[in-house]
UniProtKB/Swiss-Prot annotation:
Protein name: Isoleucine--tRNA ligase
Cofactors demanded by this protein: Zn(2+)
Cofactor: binding details: Binds 1 zinc ion per subunit.
Broad class of the protein's primary localization: cytoplasm
Record organism: Buchnera aphidicola subsp. Schizaphis graminum (strain Sg)
Sites where the protein binds Zn(2+): C903, C906, C921, C924
Length: 938
């Protein structure tokens, strides 16, 4: 038997079937960085329109987690797709370097608290620690395939950046937005520092829930005011409800709502003043079934009336009025401690009630409050206070309530509101809040709800507390008058001098300042403040300093910010406020947010649960491209699920794309684009369709990239690779590619189409499957750029002429017909009427119009349906036992088993020449010894 293998153009390629990504990717990375790929991209894009995605700085502490990977990969996909779309899209990575977590790590390493270490020495240790963490994280980010200007990353601890943060603060001071005040702010008892809203997380907590009866100071006067004609000798009480009994020592008033209706309720033991709408609920909680209504009145009547503190002697609590009192729960009256609540503080200011500062920075009561409370920690005080209330016979009810409570984002411990003297930015000064809300409307928010979310946050947010009582951070650089506490009148000029020092020495310069040299003769009249700025102020200022890296990127604002959905109250907000303060405009045109990574059950990743997946482990086992594909396949606008099963599905998708590329590469192994490319007008019709289909897909994919709809790209790619190419085009062209003459125009036409398509395909996947795209690029024949990443979308694809007989509509109908025939043949094979489609002689019954069109294709029609013979007949001549199509009207199919012999070379059942020593069909003789088979259509 003759071996015809050597007469066939069988596919060959060194592009392996097995990806071995974990082994190949490090080598690819080395090549990128040995050749400074990022610089090559920038050189190629010089002069193009800038697209600047401003990198939100991750914190320089610990290993990267899966959320970091999602964030960096999404950014990298966008940057690469923008470069591919004709933009100059740089990527300058950022890091947030100051802050408490680094302080704590350094304290652990040194075995000392920062207070016991010389500040400048401690800061240098923190700087070294941050550098080490950045080096580690940078390596991991690069391993993900993220291309950027890693050697010139933006670090908040760079001396110039530290100086610029001080410069920004100086501008804010000049505009009179900064003020100092003692007011309640979130305070962490572990950090010993104030916290911003962005540093707060809410978790469930069990708290003591108590109803306390607060006795009227003068029953007689109160009865007169309320026109109460009753003989009852019972005292009148104004009950309050609280879940923070420890705040009662700081209580200075009781607030009621002026417009609510209140009633005096007589019970067996007390006369209670309650909001009318809450009476039934309170009685139910107190388990009181019988009561009488003695009087009704508006809350405003109670203003100024005095009640006695429930357990502190000789302290009266006046009734004040406040709109914040609601009917959601409680009694309609709120005990008011301006030290421990923003609403309490605001309402107290109207009545000139000042804070008392009874709780120190560790959460302990100061002395001289009550003998049983002196020096006691507030969280141990609840039991003591409840016992005091019981002894005073004013505890109406006590139970344990589970509710959402603010916690420190670092320590995961409950925080408190504590009145301390801090520096604030006035959000309402010069209509800043209003202007910011207006600016939000000009930004494109993706998803759209992001705009509504930050808008609500801006509406409700308090003034920004920007001061912190720590050491590793940018100092506020203020000189305060010892008597008045006012900022030095020449502080702006002084800050300019300090900025120059910080640019040379870093923040450490502030702690080295000689006051006499700096202030001259007035030095002994001023104190140097050592408060540092909130780290959110630092990261929120990063958009103002990118220009130092490259002046051409210093446009008015970034094109995009992209972070997790928690950053609406974090970096998005701090950046927005600072930009409004300094430039009176938003720092971004677009803001894109992604969800959090959760496990397959929707649970948040947690070490304690044991459901975490490390990006480094995924990269080591499956490769960076699988992780990138998982990110791109996910609908990132919601929470993103990950598990080994989900990653396996990503691997399956990857395999389909890789195998499609491999098949294409294998079939152009002998193709020289400079010599063998066939012009459009000379191409086989099917090849023209394939190129036009690729053009349509490219247009769709470009639009998906433009809209950041990456999972739609993967879905479209899969359909293109599996159906339009795999099940249709690439399956059909095998016969022409393998059996025709090597250098025939028909075969080179097919190779031209494949070459064009894979040139487009490699660009489509480059932003997502970057390592694989690079590998494909290096296996493409002909001359081309060194890297796909310097290129733009492939521009040699073309469309079909819509006026042509064989236009898109023709191919759409033909593919529908093929799909129906495929189902028919599958049934025939299943019923064992034939072994495979090449044993079939198909007779198709169609309308006269369709018959006329299909007959133009002649003998080539069989290659579309992968059969050895096809006949076209009129629909009305179809035999009774023919199969009617369910999808296509006026279309029937009939099958006859082929009578001809099978050709051992092409496997078609064909005509043979008698006494043919070659034992192959006439078509194969023509292709091996003759001038070759002619193809025009398929």
């Amino acid at each position: 038997m003759n071996d015809y293998k050597n007469t066939l153009n069988l596919p060959k390629t060194q592009f392996s079937m097995r990806a071995n990504l974990s082994q190949k990717e490090p080598k690819i990375l080395k090549n990128w960085y040995d050749n400074n790929l990022y610089k090559l991209i920038r050189q190629k894009k010089e002069g193009k329109k800038i697209f600047f995605l401003h990198d939100g700085p991750p914190y320089a502490n610990g290993n990267i987690h899966i959320g970091h990977a999602v964030n960096k990969i999404l950014k990298d996909i966008i940057i690469k797709s923008k470069n591919m779309s004709g933009f100059d899209a740089p990527y300058i990575p950022s890091w947030d370097c100051h802050g408490l977590p680094i302080e704590q790590k350094v304290e652990e390493q040194m075995g000392l608290k920062s207070n016991n270490i010389i500040t400048t020495i401690f800061q240098k240790k923190c700087r070294k620690y941050a550098e080490k963490q950045i080096k580690k994280q940078k390596k991991d980010f690069i391993r993900l395939g993220v291309i950027g200007d890693w050697e010139n990353a933006h670090l908040t601890m760079d001396f110039k950046n530290e100086a610029n943060i001080i410069k920004t603060l100086s501008k804010i001071i000049e505009k009179k937005y900064l003020y100092k005040e003692s007011k309640p702010i979130h305070w962490c008892l572990k950090c010993y520092s104030s916290l911003s809203d962005a540093e707060i997380e809410h978790f469930d907590k069990e708290s003591d829930s108590i109803f306390v009866a607060i006795k009227s100071k003068n029953n007689k006067i109160l009865k007169e005011v309320l026109n109460l004609n009753i003989s009852s000798e019972k005292d009148i009480y104004l009950p309050i409800w609280t879940t923070t009994p420890w705040t009662l020592p700081s209580s200075q008033a009781i607030t009621v709502n002026p417009i609510f209706e209140y009633q005096i309720i007589e019970t067996k033991k007390y006369n209670l003043i309650l909001a009318k709408e809450l009476v039934k609920n309170v009685m139910k909680i107190l388990e009181i079934n019988h009561w009488n209504i003695l009087s009704s009145f508006k809350g405003k009547i109670l203003e100024g009336k005095k009640f006695l503190h429930p357990f502190l002697e000789n302290i009266s609590l006046p009734v004040i009025l406040g709109d914040h009192v609601n009917l959601d729960s409680g009694t309609g009256a709120v005990h008011t401690a301006p030290d421990h609540g923003p609403d309490d503080y605001i309402v107290s200011q109207k009545y000139k009630i000042k804070t008392m500062n009874l709780v120190d920075f560790k959460g302990n009561y100061i002395n001289n409050i009550h003998p049983k409370l002196n020096g006691v920690n507030i969280f141990q005080a609840n039991e003591i206070i409840i016992n005091l209330l019981i002894k005073k016979d004013c505890l109406l009810h006590h139970n344990i309530l589970k509710h959402s409570y603010p916690h420190c984002w670092r320590h995961k411990t409950p925080v408190i509101f504590r009145a301390t003297e801090q520096w604030f930015i006035n959000i309402d000064q010069k209509k800043l809040r209003y202007k910011t809300l207006e600016e939000i409307k000009k930004v494109s928010w993706i998803p759209k709800w992001g705009g509504s979310r930050i808008e609500e946050m801006i509406k409700k947010r308090p003034d920004w507390c920007v001061s912190r009582q720590r050491k590793w951070g940018v100092p506020m650089c203020l000189f305060l008058h010892k008597k008045t506490g006012k900022i030095h009148p020449e502080n702006t000029l002084l800050i300019k001098k300090i900025i120059k020092k910080v640019e040379l020495e870093g923040i450490e310069a502030w702690w080295k300042i000689n006051l006499k040299e700096m202030l001259g003769e007035t030095y002994n009249m001023y104190n140097q403040t050592f408060d540092i700025l909130d780290v959110w102020f630092e990261s929120g200022n990063t958009h103002t300093v990118i220009k130092y890296k490259n002046k051409k990127y210093s446009k008015n604002h970034a094109d995009m910010f992209l972070e997790g959905s928690d950053q609406h109250r974090g970096w998005f907000m701090s950046s927005l406020i600072i930009s409004m303060l300094v430039k009176n405009q938003s720092p971004y045109s677009e803001v894109l947010t992604h969800g959090f990574v959760v496990d397959k059950n929707g649970q948040k990743m947690s070490k304690s649960i044991g459901n975490t997946i490390s990006p480094n482990e995924v990269v080591k086992t499956l490769g960076g491209d699988i992780l990138r594909l998982w990110v791109a396949s996910s609908n990132y606008s919601n929470d993103i699920s990950i598990s080994n099963e989900i990653l396996k599905r990503s691997s399956d998708i990857y395999r389909r794309i890789r195998n499609t590329a491999r098949f294409m590469l294998a079939n152009i192994n002998d193709f020289n684009p400079q010599k063998n490319t066939v012009l459009k007008e000379n191409m086989v019709l099917l090849d023209r369709w394939a190129i036009s289909q690729a053009k349509i897909v490219q247009e769709e994919i470009i639009e998906f990239y433009k809209k950041y709809n990456f999972h739609a790209i993967i879905k479209r790619l899969m359909y293109f690779c599996s159906i339009e190419m795999g099940s249709f085009y690439l399956d059909i062209i095998k016969d022409r590619q393998y059996t025709l003459k090597t250098n025939s125009q028909e075969r080179r036409s097919c190779q031209t189409a494949i070459y064009y398509i894979i040139n487009a395909l490699v660009r489509w996947i480059a932003p997502i499957l970057s390592f694989t795209a690079d590998e494909i690029w290096n296996h493409l024949p002909g001359k081309h750029a060194q890297y796909v990443f310097t290129e733009e979308w492939f521009n040699k694809l073309f469309d079909l002429d819509k006026n042509d007989l064989f236009n898109r509509e023709f191919w759409k109908n033909l593919i529908e017909m093929k799909n129906e025939i495929n189902k028919f043949l599958e049934t025939e094979i299943k019923n064992k009427n034939i072994n495979n489609s090449l044993e079939a002689c198909l007779i198709l019954y169609v309308t006269p119009e369709v018959k006329k069109t299909l007959n133009i294709l002649g003998e080539e029609l069989k290659f579309i349906f992968l059969t050895s013979k096809v006949k076209i007949e009129l629909y009305n001549t179809a035999p009774i036992n023919s199969t009617k199509s369910k999808k296509i009207s006026n279309f029937k199919i009939f099958l006859k088993k082929i009578k001809e012999k099978k050709c051992p070379r092409c496997w078609h059942y064909n005509i043979f020449i008698e006494n043919n020593n070659d034992k192959i069909c006439t078509r194969c003789i023509l292709n091996t010894k003759g001038n070759g088979e002619k193809r025009f259509f398929i």
